[in-house]
Structures are given as structure tokens and as C-alpha cells.
Amino acid sequence: MSLHQFLLEPITCHAWNRDRTQIALSPNNHEVHIYKKNGSQWTKAHELKEHNGHITGIDWAPKSDRIVTCGADRNAYVWSQKDGIWKPTLVILRINRAATFVKWSPLENKFAVGSGARLISVCYFESENDWWVSKHIKKPIRSTVLSLDWHPNNVLLAAGSCDFKCRVFSAYIKEVDEKPASTPWGSKMPFGQLMSEFGGSGTGGWVHGVSFSASGSRLAWVSHDSTVSVADASKSVQVSTLRTEFLPLLSVSFVSENSVVAAGHDCCPMLFNYDDRGCLTFVSKLDVPKQSIQRNMSAMERFRNMDKRATTEDRNTALETLHQNSITQVSIYEVDKQDCRKFCTTGIDGAMTIWDFKTLESSIQGLRIM
């Protein structure tokens, strides 16, 4: 595991370039900082300044090398690099509330933006007018959209929102998409078609994170009621929900067809397994706690504790986990969702950690990624 402390401020969101030599992140303000890897060090290479509200989402297209950002200023920008300088292009989102999340489609010919306007803007490039335009998916979303993920077929889009529901929509745009083949989620896919809807009916919580599996037939999501759920379209959209004993999870990703990694307010990533019978189980926390060392306190430390914490005891305030505050995002670092070798987490502590499954399997007894 390698931990790098980028900032004292929280890292709101991050995105990697194709070969993982650069990371774009937002230091909880209106800027995007791009860091470049030099040996074992990370040095700041660029600052992207165009938004005038907090950045809420970043995604980096691996093939076309374009960055898309969205923010609380209700805008999104597509950034392209020319002669070593990143230039922004404004996207016409047509929303009257903050944008909350952005994600490139697998073919990188469109992207989706969630927002507080209770809608999803699906954006594509209109070459005759030379600008990015959007189409809206509105019904039946009844609250802020918090998370999005694309199906591998470049058409279906999963969305988690504050109305306690996770939905799968068709984001088919005839101007840029070929007619999609039938999927286990359905065969008719006009734009905005609701393919599936999960959750709600008085239970659940805000849906913080969603993730399709590599095959696209499974969908995982995490909610504010500390549940993890998986829906399997190949099993007539059977849903398996696991209520955990942990604090709410904020981000989720498939790391193989049967394994899911999620992380959130407990400050450490967790592994869940979804077997072929449709049973979802908790496997393990993926953080090996550091051993705390008992030692005697000096008089100086005793008085300092009395002054700062109103106690004479030596209470170590550092957490045993690598991250010292909530993890806000999980992303694939090496290979892909089919066979992930390493994944990355960033959090409110301003740190970024890269987790290696091979190292984790050797340090956690009985751990196997299936």
C-alpha cells in the first residue's frame, strides 16, 4: 500500500490519466490540480481554473485524453491539451442547480452529468455547431442525482439519487450512437427510457455510489442506511441487499465479476462477494490496523493534554486506518473491473492511497479475490 498526502484540505474527487502517471484532483475548491509522478514523488504540473463554484466531479477520458469537470456553478467544461496547455470548452448543461457528478461513456463520444435539478444531462458534441449540447433525462427522478455509471454497451446509464432510488436509464443518442443490441436489462432503448428501478418504498437512504460490473449484467450500489446492494439482470433482475454494521459507504466499484470494493465514513475500504447463487456477503476490511504502542507520558504531555483536551490520559487521536478521515472515492488503478490488481482511494484527509490486492492477500488471512 502506498499512501501519499497531497493536501491538508479534503480531496473532493479525482481522476487518473490512461497510464496512471498523472492524477487530476480537486482540493475542495473551484480548481483542478494535475499532479505528475516523478519517481516516488508527485509534483504539481497544471492548475485548471475556469469554474467559479466548488468542483464536484472530474473524469479523464483515457483514449482521447480529455478531462471533463463539473461544479456547483452549474457548469461543465471539457478540457483538451494543446501545446502543453489545457484549454476549456463550455458545455451547455441547461440546469438551474449545482452539477454533482460527471462520467465519460466507454466510447468517449458523450458524458453524463448528474445535478441537483433532479435530472441527468447527457452531453454530446454537435460538430456542425462546434459545441457540446445536452439532452435531459428527467422522469421519474425526484431528487438530487449523486452518482452515475455507464454500462459497457455505451447506452445504458445507472444513476443513484437522494430519493433513495437506484435506476437504470437508456441514454441512447441517435446522433452519435449505433442502434444498441438487446441486453439482459431490456431490448427497447429510446432515450430516457427507464429500464429498471430499485429501492425506495419507505426504506433505504441516499444512494451515494453505483457501479456496473465488467459484463454489464450486474449493478452494485451503496446507500446512506449502510446497505450494499447488487442487482443481477441475468437472474431476472434479482436484488440482493446486505445491511452492514458499518458507517455509510460513499463509493463502490466492481473489482471482478463477483467482487465489490466499497469505502466511506469508516475510513477503510471493504470487500464484498456476490456469488453465482445471488448471495451477497461481507468478506473483509482491507486495511491492516497499525499496532498502537503503550508508553509513559511526560509531565509536559500531561499538561498539554489537560489544556487541549481537558484530560490527563494519553488518548491517541490518530485512527488505526491509513486514511484519517472518510473516503470519498474508489477508482480502479491497475487493469479493469474484470480483473482489478490495484485500486485507489482518496478522502477528506487529503490523502491518496493505492491498494495492491496481491499484498492484501498475503497480509490478511484467508483473503481471496474471486
Swiss-Prot record:
What species is given as this protein's source? Rattus norvegicus
WD-type repeats, residues: 6-45, 50-89, 140-179, 202-241, 244-284, 322-365
Task: Please list the GO terms describing molecular function.
Answer: actin filament binding
Q: Does the keyword Cytoplasm apply?
A: yes
Protein name, please? Actin-related protein 2/3 complex subunit 1A
Which Pfam families does the protein's record reference? WD40
Q: Which gene specifies this protein's sequence? A: Arpc1a
> Where, per UniProt, does this protein localize?
Cytoplasm, Cytoskeleton; Nucleus
- Where are the membrane-spanning stretches? none
* Family listed: Belongs to the WD repeat ARPC1 family.
Q: Which PROSITE patterns match?
A: WD_REPEATS_2, WD_REPEATS_REGION
Its annotated function is as follows: Probably functions as a component of the Arp2/3 complex which is involved in regulation of actin polymerization and together with an activating nucleation-promoting factor (NPF) mediates the formation of branched actin networks. In addition to its role in the cytoplasmic cytoskeleton, the Arp2/3 complex also promotes actin polymerization in the nucleus, thereby regulating gene transcription and repair of damaged DNA.
Q: How does it assemble?
A: Probable component of the Arp2/3 complex in which it may replace ARPC1B.
The record's keywords, sorted A to Z, are:
Actin-binding, Cytoplasm, Cytoskeleton, Nucleus, Repeat, WD repeat
GO CC terms in record:
Arp2/3 protein complex; cytoplasm; glutamatergic synapse; muscle cell projection membrane; nucleus; site of double-strand break; synapse
For this chain's UniProt record, which GO biological process terms are given?
Arp2/3 complex-mediated actin nucleation
